[in-house]
């Protein structure tokens, strides 16, 4: 897993091993996923992410701020719209997203579920001031994402 923030030059051979490569829309463009004309819809970014699988990285996650995020791998591609949130402070939301994504993937959960969990974590994080104090407890994130606790059984 590589979170390419801020974007720095990375050898294509190193990017090719990323599973997933995590980027925001600006970083995505910097590595060749999309252009300024890519549009802003989740579906458009999902399709761009899917086109990058195998070409740029093993799997791709693109974060899109208050719109949510998308992910793609050889198994498929997904959108996760962000729930409406009363934004107080966005500091640390990206780190909260990435940490939640990494935690769920480390548990053996699917990329699709990890994406939903991470979007919920990021959306909850922006509703409080600060960084660590704004991260919601696991059970609150699970409820927000509509997921159950425990390892993936499928």
Residue positions per predicted region:
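Conserved beta-alpha-beta core of the PfkB/ribokinase-like small-molecule kinase fold
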Residues: 1-44, 67-69
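Conserved phosphate-binding/catalytic region of the ribokinase-like
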Residues: 9, 34-154
């Amino acid at each position: 897993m590589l979170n390419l923030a801020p974007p720095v030059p990375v050898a294509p051979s190193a990017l090719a091993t990323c599973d997933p490569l995590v980027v925001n829309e600006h970083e995505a463009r910097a590595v060749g996923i999309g252009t300024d004309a890519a549009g802003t819809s989740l579906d458009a970014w999902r399709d761009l992410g899917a086109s990058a699988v195998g070409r740029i990285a093993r799997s791709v996650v693109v974060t899109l701020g208050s719109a949510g995020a998308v992910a793609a791998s050889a198994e498929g591609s997904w959108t996760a719209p962000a729930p409406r949130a009363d934004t107080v402070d966005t500091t640390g939301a990206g780190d909260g997203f990435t940490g939640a994504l990494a935690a769920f993937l480390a548990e053996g959960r699917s990329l699709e579920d990890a994406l939903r969990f991470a979007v919920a974590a990021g959306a909850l994080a922006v509703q409080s001031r600060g960084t660590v104090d704004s991260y919601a407890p696991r059970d609150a994130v699970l409820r927000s994402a509509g997921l159950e606790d425990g390892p993936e059984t499928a």
